[in-house]
Protein backbone atom coordinates (compact mmCIF):
# COMPACT_ATOMS: atom_id res chain seq x y z
CA UNK A 1 0.00 0.00 0.00
CA UNK A 2 1.65 3.22 -1.22
CA UNK A 3 0.75 5.89 1.31
CA UNK A 4 2.31 9.35 1.40
CA UNK A 5 3.87 10.80 4.54
CA UNK A 6 1.10 13.42 4.64
CA UNK A 7 -1.56 10.70 4.55
CA UNK A 8 0.24 8.85 7.34
CA UNK A 9 0.40 12.05 9.37
CA UNK A 10 -3.32 12.74 8.95
CA UNK A 11 -4.16 9.17 9.94
CA UNK A 12 -2.01 9.55 13.05
CA UNK A 13 -3.79 12.79 14.00
CA UNK A 14 -7.05 10.84 14.04
CA UNK A 15 -5.53 8.70 16.78
CA UNK A 16 -3.46 11.25 18.72
CA UNK A 17 -4.81 14.84 18.63
CA UNK A 18 -1.43 16.59 18.59
CA UNK A 19 1.72 15.18 17.02
CA UNK A 20 4.93 17.19 16.70
CA UNK A 21 7.11 17.05 13.59
CA UNK A 22 9.82 15.44 15.73
CA UNK A 23 7.45 12.65 16.75
CA UNK A 24 6.35 12.09 13.17
CA UNK A 25 9.94 11.98 11.93
CA UNK A 26 10.87 9.44 14.61
CA UNK A 27 7.89 7.25 13.73
CA UNK A 28 8.85 7.34 10.04
CA UNK A 29 12.42 6.36 10.94
CA UNK A 30 11.12 3.55 13.13
CA UNK A 31 8.97 2.29 10.25
CA UNK A 32 12.03 2.31 7.99
CA UNK A 33 14.12 0.37 10.51
CA UNK A 34 11.36 -2.21 10.90
CA UNK A 35 11.34 -2.80 7.15
CA UNK A 36 15.14 -3.03 6.98
CA UNK A 37 15.48 -5.49 9.83
CA UNK A 38 12.40 -7.53 8.94
CA UNK A 39 14.24 -8.78 5.86
CA UNK A 40 16.59 -10.64 8.21
CA UNK A 41 14.61 -11.38 11.39
CA UNK A 42 10.90 -11.91 11.93
CA UNK A 43 9.69 -8.71 13.58
CA UNK A 44 6.26 -8.55 11.94
CA UNK A 45 4.29 -10.90 9.73
CA UNK A 46 5.02 -10.49 6.02
CA UNK A 47 1.28 -10.22 5.43
CA UNK A 48 1.14 -7.01 7.48
CA UNK A 49 4.05 -5.22 5.78
CA UNK A 50 1.77 -3.38 3.29
CA UNK A 51 -0.30 -2.05 6.22
CA UNK A 52 2.56 -1.58 8.70
CA UNK A 53 1.65 2.03 9.47
CA UNK A 54 -1.95 1.23 10.35
CA UNK A 55 -1.71 -2.31 11.69
CA UNK A 56 1.28 -1.78 13.96
CA UNK A 57 2.24 1.88 14.39
CA UNK A 58 -1.23 3.42 14.67
CA UNK A 59 -2.46 0.42 16.63
CA UNK A 60 0.32 1.14 19.13
CA UNK A 61 -0.12 4.92 19.08
CA UNK A 62 -3.70 4.68 20.33
CA UNK A 63 -2.38 3.35 23.66
CA UNK A 64 -0.48 6.48 24.69
CA UNK A 65 -3.33 9.06 24.91
CA UNK A 66 -5.25 6.84 27.33
CA UNK A 67 -2.80 7.74 30.10
CA UNK A 68 -0.31 10.22 28.67
CA UNK A 69 0.00 11.87 32.09
CA UNK A 70 1.91 8.89 33.49
CA UNK A 71 5.69 8.87 33.19
CA UNK A 72 6.92 5.38 34.05
CA UNK A 73 5.87 2.67 31.61
CA UNK A 74 6.79 -0.99 31.20
CA UNK A 75 6.13 -3.17 28.15
CA UNK A 76 6.23 -6.95 28.45
CA UNK A 77 7.26 -9.17 25.54
CA UNK A 78 8.29 -6.17 23.45
CA UNK A 79 9.16 -8.12 20.30
CA UNK A 80 9.41 -5.73 17.37
CA UNK A 81 8.70 -2.71 19.56
CA UNK A 82 4.92 -2.51 19.50
CA UNK A 83 3.66 -0.64 21.41
CA UNK A 84 6.85 0.05 23.41
CA UNK A 85 8.93 1.99 20.87
CA UNK A 86 5.93 4.05 19.77
CA UNK A 87 5.25 4.99 23.40
CA UNK A 88 8.95 5.82 23.88
CA UNK A 89 8.78 8.19 20.91
CA UNK A 90 5.87 10.06 22.50
CA UNK A 91 7.68 10.19 25.85
CA UNK A 92 10.75 11.63 24.11
CA UNK A 93 8.70 14.49 22.70
CA UNK A 94 7.24 15.12 26.14
CA UNK A 95 10.83 15.32 27.46
CA UNK A 96 9.77 13.37 30.53
CA UNK A 97 9.21 9.75 31.39
CA UNK A 98 10.79 6.41 30.63
CA UNK A 99 9.75 2.97 29.44
CA UNK A 100 11.26 -0.42 30.33
CA UNK A 101 11.10 -3.07 27.61
CA UNK A 102 11.26 -6.76 28.53
CA UNK A 103 12.23 -9.24 25.79
CA UNK A 104 14.00 -12.61 25.78
CA UNK A 105 14.81 -13.00 22.06
CA UNK A 106 18.41 -11.95 21.39
CA UNK A 107 17.87 -10.85 17.79
CA UNK A 108 14.89 -8.71 18.73
CA UNK A 109 16.90 -7.27 21.62
CA UNK A 110 19.56 -6.15 19.12
CA UNK A 111 16.90 -4.49 16.99
CA UNK A 112 15.26 -2.70 19.92
CA UNK A 113 18.57 -1.38 21.22
CA UNK A 114 19.50 -0.14 17.75
CA UNK A 115 16.23 1.79 17.44
CA UNK A 116 16.56 3.26 20.93
CA UNK A 117 20.13 4.36 20.22
CA UNK A 118 19.46 5.83 16.77
CA UNK A 119 16.35 7.72 17.88
CA UNK A 120 17.74 8.63 21.30
CA UNK A 121 14.69 7.30 23.11
CA UNK A 122 14.03 7.30 26.88
CA UNK A 123 13.90 3.52 27.07
CA UNK A 124 15.81 0.58 28.54
CA UNK A 125 15.73 -2.96 27.18
CA UNK A 126 15.98 -5.85 29.63
CA UNK A 127 17.20 -9.08 28.03
CA UNK A 128 15.44 -11.59 30.25
CA UNK A 129 12.29 -13.52 30.91
CA UNK A 130 9.44 -11.52 32.40
CA UNK A 131 9.70 -13.42 35.69
CA UNK A 132 13.33 -12.27 36.01
CA UNK A 133 12.64 -8.55 35.63
CA UNK A 134 10.64 -8.06 38.82
CA UNK A 135 13.68 -7.17 40.93
CA UNK A 136 15.40 -5.17 38.18
CA UNK A 137 12.96 -2.33 37.62
CA UNK A 138 10.91 0.12 39.60
CA UNK A 139 7.23 -0.76 39.67
CA UNK A 140 5.67 1.16 36.76
CA UNK A 141 2.67 3.44 36.48
CA UNK A 142 1.49 1.67 33.33
CA UNK A 143 2.09 -1.84 32.01
CA UNK A 144 1.46 -2.71 28.36
CA UNK A 145 1.40 -5.98 26.44
CA UNK A 146 0.35 -6.78 22.88
CA UNK A 147 -0.24 -10.31 21.63
CA UNK A 148 1.72 -11.85 24.50
CA UNK A 149 -0.56 -14.31 26.31
CA UNK A 150 -4.14 -14.92 27.38
CA UNK A 151 -5.49 -12.58 30.04
CA UNK A 152 -5.29 -15.12 32.86
CA UNK A 153 -1.59 -15.73 32.16
CA UNK A 154 -0.94 -12.01 31.71
CA UNK A 155 -2.38 -11.19 35.11
CA UNK A 156 -0.13 -13.83 36.64
CA UNK A 157 2.89 -12.24 34.92
CA UNK A 158 2.10 -8.63 35.81
CA UNK A 159 0.89 -9.23 39.37
CA UNK A 160 4.35 -8.83 41.01
CA UNK A 161 4.79 -5.46 39.24
CA UNK A 162 1.54 -3.94 40.43
CA UNK A 163 0.86 -1.25 43.01
CA UNK A 164 -2.52 0.15 44.01
CA UNK A 165 -2.05 2.85 41.36
CA UNK A 166 -0.69 0.73 38.50
CA UNK A 167 -2.77 0.48 35.34
CA UNK A 168 -2.41 -2.28 32.74
CA UNK A 169 -3.33 -1.52 29.12
CA UNK A 170 -3.65 -4.85 27.35
CA UNK A 171 -4.51 -5.11 23.65
CA UNK A 172 -6.84 -7.97 22.84
CA UNK A 173 -8.58 -9.39 19.78
CA UNK A 174 -12.03 -10.77 19.06
CA UNK A 175 -11.93 -13.42 21.83
CA UNK A 176 -11.41 -10.89 24.60
CA UNK A 177 -14.78 -11.62 26.27
CA UNK A 178 -13.88 -15.29 26.68
CA UNK A 179 -10.50 -14.30 28.11
CA UNK A 180 -12.16 -12.00 30.65
CA UNK A 181 -14.51 -14.79 31.75
CA UNK A 182 -11.67 -17.28 32.11
CA UNK A 183 -9.46 -14.84 34.00
CA UNK A 184 -12.29 -13.92 36.36
CA UNK A 185 -12.19 -17.43 37.80
CA UNK A 186 -8.77 -16.68 39.28
CA UNK A 187 -8.64 -12.89 39.56
CA UNK A 188 -10.70 -9.92 40.65
CA UNK A 189 -9.97 -6.61 38.93
CA UNK A 190 -11.42 -3.29 37.88
CA UNK A 191 -11.97 -3.15 34.14
CA UNK A 192 -12.57 -0.53 31.45
CA UNK A 193 -12.92 -1.58 27.82
CA UNK A 194 -11.68 0.83 25.17
CA UNK A 195 -12.71 0.02 21.62
CA UNK A 196 -9.79 -0.12 19.22
CA UNK A 197 -9.65 2.75 16.73
CA UNK A 198 -7.90 0.46 14.27
CA UNK A 199 -9.76 -2.87 14.40
CA UNK A 200 -13.47 -3.00 15.20
CA UNK A 201 -13.07 -6.50 16.65
CA UNK A 202 -10.30 -5.52 19.06
CA UNK A 203 -10.19 -3.73 22.40
CA UNK A 204 -7.75 -2.27 24.88
CA UNK A 205 -8.46 -3.64 28.33
CA UNK A 206 -7.64 -1.14 31.06
CA UNK A 207 -7.14 -3.15 34.23
CA UNK A 208 -6.37 -2.01 37.76
CA UNK A 209 -6.67 -3.13 41.39
CA UNK A 210 -5.91 -6.76 40.58
CA UNK A 211 -6.56 -9.27 43.37
CA UNK A 212 -5.89 -12.99 43.30
CA UNK A 213 -8.75 -15.36 44.10
CA UNK A 214 -6.33 -18.21 44.69
CA UNK A 215 -5.64 -17.25 48.25
UniProtKB/Swiss-Prot annotation:
E.C. number: 2.1.1.170
Highest taxon, organism lineage: Bacteria
InterPro entries, per database record: rRNA_ssu_MeTfrase_G, SAM-dependent_MTases_sf
Keyword Transferase included in the entry's annotation: yes
Coiled-coil segments on the chain, per record: none
Known catalytic reactions: guanosine(527) in 16S rRNA + S-adenosyl-L-methionine = N(7)-methylguanosine(527) in 16S rRNA + S-adenosyl-L-homocysteine
Primary location class: cytoplasm
Family label: Belongs to the methyltransferase superfamily. RNA methyltransferase RsmG family.
Keywords (A to Z) from UniProt: Cytoplasm, Methyltransferase, rRNA processing, S-adenosyl-L-methionine, Transferase
Function: Specifically methylates the N7 position of guanine in position 527 of 16S rRNA.
Protein name: Ribosomal RNA small subunit methyltransferase G
Any Pfam family matching the protein: GidB
Residue numbers binding S-adenosyl-L-methionine: 77, 82, 130-131, 146
Annotated compartments: Cytoplasm
Disulfide bonds: none
Gene Ontology molecular functions: rRNA (guanine-N7-)-methyltransferase activity
GO cellular component terms attached to this protein's record: cytosol
Amino acid sequence: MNVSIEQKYQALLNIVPFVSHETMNDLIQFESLILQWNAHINLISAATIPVLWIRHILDSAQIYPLHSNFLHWCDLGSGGGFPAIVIAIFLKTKKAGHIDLVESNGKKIAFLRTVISQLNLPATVHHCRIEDVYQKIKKPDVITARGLACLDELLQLIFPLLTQKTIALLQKGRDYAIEITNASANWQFDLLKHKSKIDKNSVILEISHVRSCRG
